[in-house]
Amino acid sequence: MPSKARNIAGRPIGRVETRDWIYLAIIIAFGGSSFAMIRGAVETIPPAVIAVSRLWIGAAVLCAFVVAKRRKFPKFLAPGENGPRLHRAWGSMLAVGVVGNTVPFFIFPWAQQYVDSGLAGIYMAFMPIWTLGLGFLFADESITPQKVVGFGLGFVGVVILMGPDAMSGAASASTLAQAAMLFAAFLYAGSAVLARRAPPVRPRVYAAGVLLCAAVAATPSLFFVDFASDQWSLTSILCVIGLGVFPTGLNAFVIVALIRRAGAGFMALANYLTPLWAVLLGAAIYAERLSLSTFLALGVILIGVFVTQRRPAPQSDLDNASLHPDSAAAHRNLADNAVDDGK
């Protein structure tokens, strides 16, 4: 018997619609463009400054949308048995912000000093695999044969895209750096599942809170950085602004919205297509050469995505109990915590 659970869009969970594919395409475009912008930013600006700046810019963009739409953030503190405590919504936003933004944003610049970008792309392809397992364990997202085969094909496609040189580089690259990249991919997956289980807060408000928390947590790192701001070029500054507005700010809202509509597993498919988009964008902007393996990888990845979505899997009612505003759990959360859902 099919599940009657419905998501925040008011439709059965597991049904992927046209808007979800549009959201996925936006995530891929923003995420893939970040590599080109990072390349321009790091030419004259320290990585830590880039990480903190893009978080604050992204938070400012989303907060501006929140104010323009006259939405409200939930109260920071909520009454508890032993006195005021951190509001449940803010606790969730803090966890997702630190786990999915602050820590990975610092891990990758450090690790890429010892691991080339091709190998980094392969390790990022572990994120959907982590998400598949974590979603099954903690978010009631089913594991089906179609998903296993599709996610496996997606991973193979990324390996083909990056080429044999990336795989051979694993032997000479720092073991600690490679482990750090795997851990960062795990954190991204964990943050996606945490966002899936978030209290019923509007996606725009939730995404703004996530970036605010991430920016605050990341800011102390600037005390240990040599700014050398007199060496910053206009191109690098514009790249940082672009990183903050698009891959960090607007992308955060789209990611949260897509996770709540279609699930963490579907959103994670972007990690298979983002490296491909980055390669194509690099060819367009930096005249990087496209090889036959690029088009072979495209075919394998697209087949993998098709297989994962060939037969939507039913989900349990628990999957979206805390996300659907009309659910009993949502009403209990709203009553207990006075979360503003933006209505």
PLM features per residue range, with description:
Residues 29-35, 63-124, 160, 244-262:
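Specific transmembrane alpha-helical segments of multi-pass solute transporters/efflux pumps
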Residues 37, 62, 131-133, 137, ...:
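Transmembrane alpha-helical segments that form core, pore/gating elements
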Residues 51-53, 101, 119-126, 193-215, ...:
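Helix-helix packing/entry segments at the starts of transmembrane helices
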Residues 41, 50, 54, 111, ...:
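Hydrophobic/aromatic residues within transmembrane alpha-helices
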Residues 62, 134, 143-165, 188, ...:
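Hydrophobic transmembrane alpha-helices of multi-pass small-molecule transport proteins
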Residues 29-60, 78-80, 110, 116, ...:
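Juxtamembrane helix-loop-helix junctions in multi-pass membrane proteins
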Residues 29-32, 36, 63, 97-102, ...:
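Hydrophobic/small/kink-forming positions within alpha-helical transmembrane segments
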Residues 16-21, 43-52, 82-90, 163-187, ...:
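Juxtamembrane helix-entry segments on the extracytoplasmic side of multipass membrane proteins
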